[in-house]
């Protein structure tokens, strides 16, 4: 009871009226109010100021804000306020430290850290930096795979653009050329058949073919007519012995048969007699025609080098210049007896390959060409080297019919191209 009375006296100053005691109590109440303002945070509201400090310094600042203990009488109410203030400060510090650890890059709670004063252990490691090395290694592997894919040259489908062309027969074209390769051996002759001829030789054959190239150009005939003409001559001479004075007649009749088979408008017999300087009569021409078709057993239609040339030029995506150059090289080969050892498909492939090397100045043979020709680059080098040699000598000597033909504007002066001499150097 005595303690409660003292409490009521200290807390209720209105019980005292004036005097020294009342002044002392009033001064004590003002002093307690000042102390409460210094210790209790819940007093006067302050403006929100955001300072950039390190997390370690922030804890020090919070500790410094706690005022030194004041020696004063403590009531129950004041003690409860001090205890609650310490508890709230401790909980706030714990929450801020946990928040800084969990989300160091978050801006929702306005925690700003100065990089200059930030300790090394407080710096978060970005995820991008942690995965830098694996990402680089994976990208390098991807680049290596992509480079390998680039190096692997794909085989192009050359028949898709002609799918809607009924004359191209794109759906049967592979079967057709597969058949041509099987039967092309029937159009080949023995490379030494001239040995059984007693009155003619290789040189005479070359003169005849060179003259027929000029006649072919004079009548403006198609390419396939010339190739079939030379094939008929060789196949006939392999089976039949011919005297020297009848050799030109064999050439005229072979061209007549080829024109009947390939051309829309066939030259008349009188024109052929006239171009031969009337060396033969009409009767002799018709008689030799009967002899030739019987010797060949009427087997006129055979795959020549021209048949394969059209396909291989398409595989090479040849333009007009490359096409003319390839035909120039293969017509030079028609004159040479030594080229009979090569099959028609190999001659055509070698002509396309040599023409590409001549145009580009380097060896050029794509996977598409190799696929459609069935010949690798190594398989064509021997034939190609001979063609380059013929090209170098085309403008010299007496047999220059093909060179003069391809030196005109009609054939874009193709014969004036520099030969691919580097193919001969590689052979050496």
Swiss-Prot record:
GO terms for biological process: cell division; mitotic cell cycle phase transition. The keyword Cell cycle applies. The keyword Electron transport does not apply. SMART domains: CYCLIN, Cyclin_C. CDD domains: CYCLIN_AtCycB-like_rpt1, CYCLIN_AtCycB-like_rpt2. It comes from the Eukaryota. Transmembrane segments: none annotated. One of its GO terms (molecular function) is cyclin-dependent protein serine/threonine kinase regulator activity. Residues 1-22 are annotated as: Disordered. Interacts with the CDC2 protein kinase to form a serine/threonine kinase holoenzyme complex also known as maturation promoting factor (MPF). The cyclin subunit imparts substrate specificity to the complex. Essential for the control of the cell cycle at the G2/M (mitosis) transition. Belongs to the cyclin family. Cyclin AB subfamily. This is G2/mitotic-specific cyclin-1. It comes from Medicago sativa subsp. varia.
């Amino acid at each position: 009871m005595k303690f409660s009375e003292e409490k009521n006296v200290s807390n209720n100053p209105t019980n005292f009226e004036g005097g020294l005691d009342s002044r002392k109590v009033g001064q004590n109440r003002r002093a307690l109010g000042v102390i409460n303002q210094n210790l209790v945070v819940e007093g006067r509201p302050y403006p929100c100021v955001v300072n950039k400090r390190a997390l370690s310094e922030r804890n020090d600042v919070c500790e410094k804000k706690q005022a030194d203990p004041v020696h004063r009488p403590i009531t129950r109410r004041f003690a409860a306020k001090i205890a609650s203030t310490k508890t709230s400060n401790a909980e706030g510090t714990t929450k801020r430290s946990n928040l800084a650890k969990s989300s160091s890059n978050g801006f929702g709670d306005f925690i700003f850290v100065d990089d200059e004063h930030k300790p090394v252990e407080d710096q978060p490691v970005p995820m991008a930096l942690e995965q830098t090395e694996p990402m680089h290694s994976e990208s390098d592997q991807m680049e290596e795979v992509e480079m390998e894919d680039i190096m692997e040259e794909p085989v192009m489908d050359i028949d898709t653009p002609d799918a809607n062309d009924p004359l191209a027969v794109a759906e049967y074209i592979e079967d057709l050329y597969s058949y041509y390769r099987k039967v092309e051996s029937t159009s080949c002759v023995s490379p030494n058949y001239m040995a059984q001829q007693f009155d003619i030789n290789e040189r005479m054959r070359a003169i005849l073919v060179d003259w027929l190239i000029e006649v072919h150009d004079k009548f403006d005939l198609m390419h396939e007519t010339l190739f079939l003409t030379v094939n008929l001559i060789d196949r006939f001479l392999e089976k039949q012995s011919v005297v020297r004075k009848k050799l030109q007649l064999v050439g005229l009749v072979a061209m007549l048969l080829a024109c009947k088979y390939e051309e829309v408008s066939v030259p008349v017999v009188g024109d052929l007699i006239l171009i031969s300087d009337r060396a033969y009569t009409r009767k002799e021409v018709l008689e030799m025609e009967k002899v030739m078709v019987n010797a060949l057993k009427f087997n006129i239609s055979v795959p020549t080098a021209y048949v394969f040339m059209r396909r291989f030029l398409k595989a090479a995506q040849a333009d007009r210049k490359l096409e003319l150059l390839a035909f120039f090289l293969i017509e030079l080969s028609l004159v040479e007896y030594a080229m009979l050892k090569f099959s028609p498909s190999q001659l055509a492939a070698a002509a396309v390959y040599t023409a590409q090397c001549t145009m580009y100045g380097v060896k050029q043979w794509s996977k598409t060409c190799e696929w459609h020709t069935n010949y690798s680059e190594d398989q064509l080098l021997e034939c190609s080297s001979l063609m380059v040699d013929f090209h170098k000598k085309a403008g010299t000597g007496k047999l220059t019919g093909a060179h003069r033909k391809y030196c005109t504007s009609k054939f874009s002066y193709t014969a004036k191209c520099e030969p691919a001499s580097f193919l001969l150097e590689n052979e050496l």
